């Protein structure tokens, strides 16, 4: 897995990285985030270990791309068939999941859909599948009940995420499938903050981490 490296990431002197791993949780960017790619981001962490971390940004749309257009580009449907897609598929946003492998699709979805040797169950309510088969199923109306598609992912090298958290770059909280799948993109950031117990208007760059 290729990981990103950002200049603002440094370990705070005298502090140790967080001991626990956060896969299956949400990362919520602090206002002081200096990397514009991650400003006001809500990221679902798919994997986190001593080797690094990988997550999907779940609240930023991909520029000038929707699900019907993507399905046509991938030759999953013909242009003429786009109007016949299930309504919820036609309105499904395509997200900017992160700067790593930004041409590759990743689908976070409910656990009612599974592809052997391709679907990763991250927690009880959220799975990850990154094959074209799930897009074919979604287009046919036989895919998961809930799903979001993202292009690319955010990655961290060993110890990098822990350092960012210690430096007050991120808050974190348990993931809520309803926030990920059923909340408007522009409402996810504030909802995630409130889930932590923080009123967005009161948050400052000097706030501590959860």
UniProtKB/Swiss-Prot annotation:
GO CC annotations, alphabetized: cytosol
Pfam families, alphabetized: DUF179
InterPro entries: AlgH-like
Top-level lineage group: Bacteria
NCBIfam families documented for this protein: PRK00228.1-4 (NF001268)
Database matches in HAMAP family: UPF0301
UniProt family annotation: Belongs to the UPF0301 (AlgH) family.
Protein name: UPF0301 protein Mnod_6933
Species annotation: Methylobacterium nodulans (strain LMG 21967 / CNCM I-2342 / ORS 2060)
